[in-house]
Amino acid sequence: MEKNSVNKAIRNAIKRGEINSVKELIGSNKTILHTMTSFGSWLHIAAKKGQMEIVEYLVHKGIDVNIKGDIFDASPLRVAAGEGYVEIVQYLIQSGVKLDVSSAKRNPLFAAIYGGHKEVVEHLVDQGIDISVQYTGENIEDMDAYRYAKEFGQIEIAEYLKRKLNEKVQKRVLKD
């Protein structure tokens, strides 16, 4: 099977959740395992499609959980957070993924906010993601997670983040 056919077969097997087909197609071939597509790595695709069993398999096989890819040049964590797959978010964090806040587009918290996934937001906050970092870019200016949630009409998430920001300030005041 030629490379493009193999890649398409793997991508389709991941989308359908066919773990045995994925295992057979990748086998022990490290080159195929570490293929980067226009959609990102196989881990990005599995995270986007909510395929937990395949995510676990790929991580076990050795795909870097911090690999950058997809249209935002972001991690699979950002993809899973944006889709609302809290179990995959939890697994990737347990597997050592970094909470990348280097840009708004890479920030998994902003992806979860945009998607309206409060449970993912809460988990990321519990794991210590920086909720006060501010970004200025294409359509945002000095915007932190709270303002981003308000901007996109995620009122319940915005209220939660405001409480967390206030708690953070109170802890700092008590510490001083």
What are the residue ranges of the model-derived segments?
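Ankyrin-repeat-protein effector appendages
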Residues: M1-A9, S95, Q127, E141-D176
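Alpha-helical adaptor scaffolds
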Residues: K68-Q90
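Ankyrin repeat domain, specifically the short helix-to-loop turn at the C-terminus of the second helix
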Residues: E24-T31, E56-D64, Q90-K98, H123-D130, ...
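N-terminal segments that cap or nucleate solenoid repeat domains
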Residues: E2-I45
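Conserved ankyrin/ankyrin-like repeat signature
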Residues: S21, E53-I54, E87-I88, E119-V120, ...
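Ankyrin-repeat boundary/"N-cap" motif
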Residues: N4-I10, T35-W42, K68-S75, S102-P108, ...
